[in-house]
């Protein structure tokens, strides 16, 4: 079961790469068509940017993601309780000891990152450490260590990189359009242009607006399914389903994180760090905690 999941996650990594690079190529082509009169040129530039983003995240994911989330590294002397729990979970999971970080935030949350089990790290908020008892902390860290063991972190890391690249390119195009960089240039071309030019203009604008949304939805679909598996894997490590249930119950009652968490990083956390309501529920990075608890009760 476990080895099948690891193999599945490795296959999903390549599928994920393909989908995100297709979206990136679409945005690049649209930006190139609108601003430099060369869709192909924009496509090539976008793919180069995406490749650099993905490569940098693979080799420097821990430093980049921890910096993005304001985490500080700790050790056995500065955070002995957290360090020893992570050490125990890593030993049971038979993976190398990950680096350990703390985020100074009163909300209850945690995440794991890295490109593989040999280059991984976990982070927990100060609020989580203050509220969770030992069994609950073991359950949460077992969840994060499971993400490492199951190679979920590689998928998450690549997703963060490529969603960031797509969002950056779309945002750049939006600012240039705001200042009229493409509007004046293309309006002169299209005033006497044919229907194809107008269609290309509309499609390019839609690509710039919708590609970040599409990339986020792909990331969410992958993230939600992984959370169920990590919950179950944590119970496998701790042999304590009630500890995971109690931890999830406390996470459900936690407030949103006080510090800003960008959309690309939200999917990394065990608990949705934003917790919006209404329309925002469509873009939750995690399945409802009540559903996660119900699945654990059925184990």
Swiss-Prot record:
Alphabetized GO MF terms: metalloendopeptidase activity; zinc ion binding
Cofactor requirement: Zn(2+)
Topology relative to the membrane: Multi-pass membrane protein
Keywords carried by this UniProt record: Cell membrane, Hydrolase, Membrane, Metal-binding, Metalloprotease, Protease, Transmembrane, Transmembrane helix, Zinc
Any single GO BP term: proteolysis
Record Gene3D superfamilies: Metalloproteases ('zincins'), catalytic domain (3.30.2010.10)
Superkingdom of origin: Bacteria
Pfam families: Peptidase_M48
Enzymatic class: hydrolase
Record InterPro entries: HtpX_protease, Pept_M48_protease_HtpX, Peptidase_M48
Cellular localisation: Cell membrane
Active site: 144
Transmembrane segments: 15-35, 39-59, 158-178, 198-218
Residues at which Zn(2+) binds: 143, 147, 227
GO cellular component: plasma membrane
Record note on cofactor: Binds 1 zinc ion per subunit.
Keyword Hydrolase: yes
EC number: 3.4.24.-
Family statement drawn from the similarity comment of this UniProt entry: Belongs to the peptidase M48B family.
Protein name: Protease HtpX homolog
Gene coding for it: htpX
């Amino acid at each position: 079961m476990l080895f099948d999941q690891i193999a599945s996650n490795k296959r999903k990594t390549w599928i994920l790469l393909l989908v995100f690079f297709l979206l990136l190529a679409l945005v690049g082509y649209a930006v190139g068509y609108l601003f430099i009169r060369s869709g192909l040129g924009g496509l090539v530039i976008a793919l180069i940017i995406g490749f650099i983003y993905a490569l940098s995240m693979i080799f420097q994911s821990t430093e980049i993601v921890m910096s993005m989330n304001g985490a500080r590294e700790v050790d056995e002397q500065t955070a002995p309780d957290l360090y020893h729990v992570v050490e125990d979970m890593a030993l049971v999971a038979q993976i190398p000891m990950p680096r350990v970080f703390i985020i100074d935030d009163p909300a209850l949350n945690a995440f794991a990152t890295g490109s593989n089990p040999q280059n991984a790290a976990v982070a927990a908020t100060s609020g989580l450490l203050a509220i969770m008892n030992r069994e609950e902390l073991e359950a949460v860290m077992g969840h994060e260590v499971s993400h490492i063991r199951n190679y979920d972190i590689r998928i998450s890391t690549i997703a963060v990189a490529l969603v960031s690249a797509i969002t950056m390119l779309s945002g750049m195009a939006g600012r240039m359009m705001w200042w009229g960089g493409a509007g004046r240039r293309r309006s002169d071309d299209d005033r006497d242009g044919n229907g194809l030019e107008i269609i290309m203009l509309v499609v390019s604008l839609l690509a710039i607006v919708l590609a970040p949304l599409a990339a986020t939805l792909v990331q969410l679909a992958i993230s939600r399914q992984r959370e169920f598996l990590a919950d179950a894997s944590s119970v496998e490590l701790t042999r304590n389903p009630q500890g995971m249930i109690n931890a999830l119950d406390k996470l459900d009652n936690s407030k949103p994180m006080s510090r800003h968490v960008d959309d690309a990083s939200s999917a990394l956390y065990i608990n949705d760090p934003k917790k919006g309501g209404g329309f925002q529920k469509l873009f939750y990075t995690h399945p409802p905690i009540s559903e996660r608890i119900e699945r654990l009760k059925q184990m």
